[in-house]
């Protein structure tokens, strides 16, 4: 089942919440539900929508396009968006949750490195001299991040952008870049209801076995075992619920200065 909505320039997180909820409803009725959204704004933390899906025993696949902020592979100026995608898969109390942008580092992560003054672990993009750099501040200045997997991330970014704009009847990244602000984005919300499938118990068993097998991989660094995507997030969430949410010192000082 497929539905298309106009976000009417509304708050991105509220629009995304409503579309995720509707995609889940469609999935419960039809096994697969797809909702496409045009003319919306930044959806904030897409992992939350993945958690909404898995709470209803649905697989969730969500993505958005963005303003141009990444050069295509072989290019030197921004033509692609880093078009974040979230994939969520139910698994006991700790779902598999892949929440990634198509750039080496999300712009939120670049801000964290900029405030800390630490270099990135690998080159993350181009500086104003069009040279590779590990300096997050320089990448934030140019808005020219490297795509993940280099040419592969470049291709994925393009495909996600074109599919989102086509399904939503909305703007492509190129067209978003023509606006004075990052707005009128195109987004897709897909949910698949595992309860509708005849072998849902076998699916759950396969997920469990695959994750356990993955975690038995010999770690590169002793004392740092392999975790599946989403496991660390669950640990951090549990700690935050018990001990509170940590705030960077620089940000906390800004709060105190208000």
Predicted regions and their residues:
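Active-site cofactor/substrate anionic-group-binding motifs, chiefly glycine-
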Residues: 1-24
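General beta-strand structural signal in soluble alpha/beta enzymes
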Residues: 5-7, 34-39, 60-64, 89, ...
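A glycine-rich phosphate/pyrophosphate-binding beta-strand-loop-alpha-helix module
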Residues: 17-21, 25-63
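Glycine-rich, mobile lid/loop segments that gate access to catalytic sites or pores
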Residues: 43-81, 85, 93
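Phosphate/diphosphate-binding glycine-rich loops and adjacent basic-rich segments that engage nucleotide
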Residues: 70-137
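Secondary-shell segments that build the walls of catalytic and ion/ligand-binding clefts
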Residues: 118-176
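Catalytic-core signal marking the mid-to-C-terminal active-site face
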Residues: 167, 175-258
